[in-house]
C-alpha cells in the first residue's frame, strides 16, 4: 500500500492529501466523472453507497480538474462533516464554510386575523459570519478554493460588483491620508472602537491604525502612516500584540456582504421615493388609508436612515433598488461569486434538490401579506431566495451525489457513475423480512444477541408514540436504550450518537432521523418496524437509506418487519441484493477480505471526551478546586459560562465536554456533601 502523502496534478493549484490510494469503485468513478466534466457534460450522478468514500472521490475530482468547487449539503450537520473531511484532504488550500449565520431567526410577518405584526428578530453567529466573508474573499482571490455550504447559498448576499469595488488595497509606499483611510473603513461598514478591538472594528492611535478584518479568524492588520504615506503593514495577534508578519501589500475586504457605494445609495433613495409615490397613490385609490399611512411612515424613516448612515434596519428589502435590478429579477447570491468554470457537487441530492425548490414559495407567501397591508413596498418581494429554474440557469457543471437518486437527478443526469464497491471490502447488509405481528418480541431477542457481542442496534418506528412505548418496553426488559426525536437539539443529538458509539447504551430508537449521513460503524443491526406501511417513511429511498446504516459493520444485517412485501420493499431489497452481489463478486475476483471500519469516536464529533466520571473530572479540574467549597462554586460558574459560550458559537462538542465536566462537578458536590 502506498504511504500517505500529498499528490499534485498538472495545471492544478490543489495539493491533495491522500491517506490511501483510491480503491474499490473509486478509481473508476474518479476517471469517469473527470472525463465527463472534461467532455463538457452539464449534469452527472455519482450513485455511491454508504461507506464507499464519496467525499474522497469528490476531492480527487476537484484536485485533478484544478477548478474552484461548491459542495452543497442538505443541513448544517452534514455540511460540517463534509467541511472537516475536505479540510483533511486539502490542508494547504482554501476550504471554506458557507451556511446560514443565524443562531435564531424570526422573519418579520403580519397575521391579518389578529392584526399582529411580528418584528424581525435574529441572533447572528459571529464565527459563521466571519467564515462566510472568508468564503467570498477566497473566491475573489484564489483558484484553489472549495466551499462547503447549504441551501443558504441561494439567498441574496449583495452584489459581487459592489462588494469588489469597495475593497481597500493598501501598499507600502502608497500615498493616502489618515482621514481618507478612516472614511473608507466607515463606508465599508467597519466600526471605530478604541476600547473593544474585535472583528469588523478599527482603532486609531496617532498615525497608527489597527484594523481587524471582518473575514479574519485571528490576525489583525497594523497600518503605520508617516506624512500621508504608508510606512509599514504588519499582521499581528490582537491578544498578545506580537507581530506575526510584515507585508508589502494587503487587501481589506468590506465588513459585510451588503456594503454599497455612497452614489449607489443616493440613486436608490430616489427610486425608492418614486416607488413609494406610486404605491401610495394605488393604496389611496383602493381606499386603504391605514395601509397608506403605515407604509409612508415606515418607508420615510428608512429613507432618512439611508440618507444619513448609508444603511437601515431591513435594508435587504430595498436590495432591488440598491442593485439596480429590474422588477422580478433574481437577487445576487453566492453562486454569482463563483467563476464560470467552477464545479458543483450536490450531496444527498435527493433531499437537497427538494429544499432548493421549496425555499422560494414559503418566502413569497409571507412577503405578499406584508406588501398587501402596507408594511413593505412591492419591491421587497424581490429580496428572496432563487427559484429552482433560476438556480438551474446559474448552475455550473454539476455532480449529483446520492445513494438513492430521485426523479430530478434521473431526468437530468447525462452520465450515471456507480460507486458500489467499498475500499474496505465491506458488503451491503443481509436483508431479512419477518412477520410484523411478533415484531417486538423478536426484536428483543435480536437485541440481546447483539448486546452480548458489544454491537449496537438502530430501530426505526413510524410514530413518536410507538417510539416512546417501545423505548419504555425495552427499558423495562433490561435493555440500555435511548430515543432520538425531532425535539432533541443538535448538541444533545450529537451527544446521543457519541454515547451509542462509546457503548453507554446499546439501542437507539428513532423515526426518520436515522437515515442520511449517520456514520456509526458499531451498528450491526437495523430493525425497521411496520416496513409494509407504504408512505414517505417506508418509500424505496427511505428503506435503502435506513438499511445502509448497517453497511459499515462486518456483521451488518437489516430486518424488515412486515406481514406483506410492498412494491417499495421489493425494490429496496432487490437493489440492496444487486449491490451486495456486485460487492461480493469484486471481493472474490480480487482476493479481498472485508474488514470492519475502525473509526475513532472523536472523528465523528471532534473534541468530545469520554463520559466524565471522577477520573475525567480530576484530570480536567485542579485538585485544590475539588477540596475547596468556594473554589468549586467558582469553577461551576466558569464551566456554565464556558458551556453557553461554546453553544452560542455552535461549538457543540466543546459545549458537551464542558457540560460533562459541570455535571461531574455537581455530582461530586452532592456525593461529598460539600456546599
Curated annotation (Swiss-Prot):
Q: What is known of its domains?
A: The beta-hairpin motif is involved in DNA binding.
Similarity annotation: Belongs to the UvrB family.
Name recorded for this polypeptide: UvrABC system protein B
Q: Where is this motif: Beta-hairpin?
A: 101-124
Query: Any keyword Cytoplasm?
Result: yes
Q: Show the taxonomic lineage.
A: Bacteria, Pseudomonadati, Pseudomonadota, Betaproteobacteria, Burkholderiales
Please give the NCBIfam families that the UniProt record associates with this protein: PRK05298.1, uvrb
One Gene Ontology biological process:
nucleotide-excision repair
GO cellular component entries: cytoplasm; excinuclease repair complex
Domain named UVR is located at 633-668
Instruction: Name the gene for this chain.
Output: uvrB
Q: Domain Helicase ATP-binding spans what residues?
A: 35-422
Q: What does this protein do?
A: The UvrABC repair system catalyzes the recognition and processing of DNA lesions. A damage recognition complex composed of 2 UvrA and 2 UvrB subunits scans DNA for abnormalities. Upon binding of the UvrA(2)B(2) complex to a putative damaged site, the DNA wraps around one UvrB monomer. DNA wrap is dependent on ATP binding by UvrB and probably causes local melting of the DNA helix, facilitating insertion of UvrB beta-hairpin between the DNA strands. Then UvrB probes one DNA strand for the presence of a lesion.
Instruction: Please list the residue ranges annotated as the Helicase C-terminal domain.
Output: 439-605
Q: Could you give the subunit structure recorded for this chain?
A: Forms a heterotetramer with UvrA during the search for lesions. Interacts with UvrC in an incision complex.
